[in-house]
Amino acid sequence: MNRNPDQNTLPNITLKIIETYLGRLPSVNEYHMLKLQTRNIQKITVFNKDIFVSLVKKNKKRFFSDVDTSASEIKDRILSYFSKQTQTYNIGKLFTIIELQSVLVTTYTDILGVLTIKAPNVISSKISYNVTSMEELARDMLNSMNVAVIDKAKVMGRHNVSSLVKNVNKLMEEYLRRHNKSCICYGSYSLYLINPNIRYGDIDILQTNSRTFLIDLAFLIKFITGNNIILSKIPYLRNYMVIKDENDNHIIDSFNIRQDTMNVVPKIFIDNIYIVDPTFQLLNMIKMFSQIDRLEDLSKDPEKFNARMATMLEYVRYTHGIVFDGTRNNMPMKCIIDENTRIVTVTTKDYFSFKKCLVYLDENVLSSDILDLNADTSCDFESVTNSVYLIHDNIMYTYFSNTILLSDKGTVHEISARGLCAHILLYQMLTSGEYKQCLSDLLNSMMNRDKIPIYSHTERDKKPGRHGFINIEKDIIVF
């Protein structure tokens, strides 16, 4: 039987806190379920909603000025959400409301509210790069890799982009400057900071507090637009979340990484923003070309890739003194695939202290083998490399999350061979190891190559797990 609690037998302070929050006397079940939440509930109850409304209005004026909504509508939406619990009787939904309100009252001011106050002066730190000089070289490299055969019957799962992306990008530019110790960017926008001719869509970010930031941003968009905003978690992408609107239009996504991973990611400082070192990004691009659908993207829009590739090539030429004369030495390193065990053996003795690298195409098999080795020195760089690395008895063990392209039965295609070499070089950069000679040879191995057709490719590792989401409107959290 669901009775009201007896005020003589229950602690009056706890009861009063819950009663004030719910706007009603709690049932016995509500009381016992919510009493451990009293600290969070107190913070929500005493939270100054007027100051919060003011901050959201300032965010709206600065970053969403073209969105047609009034100050009174924003205030009504905020006050409505902070009183939503008074009309909610489902315990699960009450827990969700408390959790999300707690995030807002404890983090919003420091994360997004701070963007409305005067910013520090921007330290201009741009270097003039001669990207034009690299365009023909980039075009030659990419042309030799433009070997994908497009299946016109194949339906590609491309996300629809929200009209709010430009507003969020404006906010993100400021966010990256204010929070440059916990958030860095990569991808097209980061290259745009080097070469203004680069086109970019949304801003790709890595950060250490992704979930909190995305919740705060989702509420900001909800309060300004009135739209239902949904946060989704994809199981096969590590620590990845995306914000979409009620029509499934993509707004922004983010990868979360640990602070110790953030500390070792190579980065450079441009206009008060940290971006992932373009050398590291170039290696990631070479690695990603081993993915069959990335080659299909190249086939559809080669000029987009050419602008990015030329920018990164010029950066490494300027920064590392790379000479593009075709001297490739032992690059790409010899790669032998065992299609039964799904392990590629890369001969590394010409460049590194470890004699070979065993590249696993199934992550769970690698994890099992590492346990059998009884070694506890593996490095996990999370979504930065999508892999752990272990060096044990002069052998590197690692996982490769992309497809492996084959140029003939049992023969690794040179595009994938270079991708595997790039994957090993990512580790060298992250651990401050030697990589420059290997980098030079790898890049030179991409010059003056003929197109080699793709015979077949291995399938990617299938990741278990289910999709998670936060639906603000329906008060549901599934993770």
Curated annotation (Swiss-Prot):
Keywords: ATP-binding, Calcium, Early protein, Metal-binding, mRNA processing, Nucleotide-binding, Transcription, Transferase. Heterodimer of a large (catalytic) subunit and a small (regulatory) subunit. CDD domains: polyA_pol_Pox. It comes from Ectromelia virus (strain Moscow) (ECTV). Ca(2+) 1 binds at D202, D204. One of its GO terms (molecular function) is metal ion binding. Induction: Expressed in the early phase of the viral replicative cycle. Ca(2+) 2 binds at D202, D204, D253. Polymerase that creates the 3'-poly(A) tail of mRNA's. The active site is at D202, D204. GO terms for biological process: mRNA processing. Belongs to the poxviridae poly(A) polymerase catalytic subunit family. This is Poly(A) polymerase catalytic subunit. Its EC number is 2.7.7.19. It comes from the Viruses. It catalyses: RNA(n) + ATP = RNA(n)-3'-adenine ribonucleotide + diphosphate. InterPro entries: PolyA_pol_cat_Poxvir, PolyA_pol_cat_sf, PolyA_pol_nucTrfase_Poxvir, PolyA_pol_nucTrfase_sf_Poxvir, Poxvirus_polyA_pol_cat_C, Poxvirus_polyA_pol_cat_N, Poxvirus_polyA_pol_cat_N_sf. Pfam families: Pox_polyA_pol (PF03296), Pox_polyA_pol_C (PF12629), Pox_polyA_pol_N (PF12630).
